[in-house]
């Protein structure tokens, strides 16, 4: 694989403690950095912002916790390491409402890594 191949790692993680653990994991792995954004999932919007649907809260596990979206441009090898760490922190994403992680190819990138 060429040295310039990059992927965008996208993770949505529920809970402040989990996102702190993920950031510690990024530092321990020596990953170049990440952007962390506050995020709202459909369950959070439906169950809190639309009172008419508040009865559906039970359909959206984890809707009471804050959500964070983590974005990082990484090499494929770094993505593998980061996903393993995220799975460890988030208990393999087995519980509904814990979060998700995936990556997409980056076709063009400008800036330092």
Model-derived segments and spans:
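Positively charged, small/polar-rich N-terminal and surface patches that mediate targeting and assembly
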Residues: 1-113
């Amino acid at each position: 694989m060429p040295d310039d191949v990059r992927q965008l790692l996208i993770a949505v993680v529920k809970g402040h403690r989990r996102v702190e653990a993920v950031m510690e994991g990024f530092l321990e792995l020596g990953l170049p950095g990440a952007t962390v954004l506050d995020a709202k999932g459909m369950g959070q919007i439906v169950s809190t912002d639309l009172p008419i649907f508040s009865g559906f809260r039970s359909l959206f596990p984890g809707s009471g916790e804050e959500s964070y979206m983590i974005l990082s441009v990484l090499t494929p090898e770094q993505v593998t390491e980061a996903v393993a760490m995220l799975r460890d922190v988030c208990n393999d994403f087995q519980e509904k409402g814990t979060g998700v992680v995936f990556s997409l190819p980056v076709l063009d990138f400008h800036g330092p890594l």
